[in-house]
Amino acid sequence: MELLGSTLTATYAHPRPTPTNFLPAISTMASTYRDRFPHYNLTHSLSLPWRPSTYYKAASNWPTLDPYCTRSQRVSESTMLPFVSNRTTLFTRYTPDDWYRSNLTNFQESNTSRHNSERLRVDTSRLIQDKYQQTRKTQADSTQNLGERVNDIGFWKSEIIHELDAMIGETNELTDIKKRLERALMETEAPLQVARECLFHREKRMGIDLVHDEVEKELLTEVDTILCCQERMKLYLDKAIAQLAANRAAQHELEKDLSDKQSAYRIDDKCHHLRNTSDGVSYFHGVERVDATVSVPESWAKFTDDNILRSQSERAASAKLRDDIQNVLVVTANEMWNQFNKVNLAFTNRIAETADAKNKIQTHLAKTLQEIFQTEMTIESIKKAIVEKSAFLKVAQTRLDERTRRPNIELCRDMAQLRLVNEVYEVDDTIQTLQQRLRDAEDTLQSLAHTKATLEHDLAVKANSLYIDQDKCMSMRRSFPSTLRLVGFC
């Protein structure tokens, strides 16, 4: 019989009473029969906390109750308390058959329970052994996998370290040759300045010497050559800067990957050496459901392999760039030196030509001065001769004038008269001739003076040109950088 809504006065709420002789002692039954019904905690009603809300099952048959009752005994079903204490003592709930069947059922259930328990113990022991072996094998497999993982990480870590060392060495070498390139580029400024100053000084040449000669052509070629070399150096300098940036980027990726590998190596190596008795072993509930992985072994290996391949590619490009920079340093140094020698040779030839022209001008000037002196002496001689001839003319003319005073018939055209007339004409013609020769000599002297001035000016021009080319330009060109400095070595 199942009773609901029992109060705290129920018999099951108090200690178990002492067994009577009506039923066999409980101690005579099997231990498995004792307390075969599980104990239930009584939960209280939410509306009536003093009333339990559970129930229990006493028997499978419902007893027959007295159908007759008085009005005062009629109560609602919700407040009725069908307990033993409220029933009549003449009412019995079970029959002896029920009692024997209950015992038999309990005995059978006891045997079944013991058999099931024994089988459960055997199966459980076997299960424990199987699971223990399986767990140990699983842990061994995990340990082996961790060991293999540690070996893989160690392999890739060594590969990264090897490539990182090579990349660092290559970057250092590229940095060194970049510095050499920068020094070589700085060394080209002095020759360029010298060439430009030579052109500037040669603009101060005078007169006819301000000529577009071979020296000027070679100087302009030298300026163009140095500028072209500077452009190539600057181009390779920009390439070196960009390549250094690429090398450092690849190096950064390798260093980052190496740092991750080292951290992973420490973690996995620690996990690989963890045992059941190790310190720090604890429960982390739900950790197996957290999947924070971002790669698989294939993508993991490919990531590092790509980093190494990228670094190797950048190293190859860096090595090729270093060779190109070395070649351009040698080529530009040779080009500038060859052009420097050409300019110097042109200067030497031009200086020799100018010196020879100057010497010739000096020779002509000396001859001109000598000729001027001779011409001046000639002019003085002509003037003296004219003065001397003037006296003869005056004497002849005076004679003729005096003879005009002869009286009458004495004015005879005699030989003396004729001779005096001829003498006057002859002396006058001589004087005219001498005067013409004097004018010619004076013109010649003026021409010689002009030639002298021209030669002196030309001599000054040549001296100025020689001073510019020999003293100014060639003195500056003695400080041209050496080949070692032009290729970037100190």
Curated annotation (Swiss-Prot):
Any single GO CC term annotated in Swiss-Prot or TrEMBL for this entry: outer acrosomal membrane
Membrane-related topology note: Peripheral membrane protein
Residue ranges the record marks as coiled coil: 424-458
GO annotation (BP), single: flagellated sperm motility
Pfam families: Tektin
Keyword Phosphoprotein belongs to the record: no
Post-translational modification: N- and O-glycosylated.
Cell compartment(s), UniProt: Cytoplasm, Cytoskeleton, Cilium axoneme; Cytoplasm, Cytoskeleton, Flagellum axoneme; Cytoplasmic vesicle, Secretory vesicle, Acrosome outer membrane
Keywords: Cell projection, Cilium, Coiled coil, Cytoplasm, Cytoplasmic vesicle, Cytoskeleton, Flagellum, Glycoprotein, Membrane, Ubl conjugation
Tissues expressing this chain: Expressed in spermatozoa where it localizes to the sperm head (at protein level). Detected at lower levels in the sperm flagellum (at protein level). Expressed in trachea multiciliated cells.
Segments passing through the bilayer: none
InterPro entries attached to this UniProt entry: Tektin-like (IPR048256), Tektins (IPR000435)
Residues carrying sugar: T7, T9, N41, N86, N103, N111, N276
Domain of life: Eukaryota
Chief location: cytoplasm
Job description of the protein: Microtubule inner protein (MIP) part of the dynein-decorated doublet microtubules (DMTs) in cilia and flagellar axoneme. Forms filamentous polymers in the walls of ciliary and flagellar microtubules. Required for normal sperm mobility.
Annotated family: Belongs to the tektin family.
PANTHER family registered for this protein in UniProt: TEKTIN (PTHR19960), TEKTIN-3 (PTHR19960:SF24)
Subunit comment: Microtubule inner protein component of sperm flagellar doublet microtubules. Interacts with TEKT1, TEKT2, TEKT4 and TEKT5. Interacts with CCDC38.
Protein name, entry field: Tektin-3
Organism this protein belongs to: Bos taurus
Gene expressing this chain: TEKT3
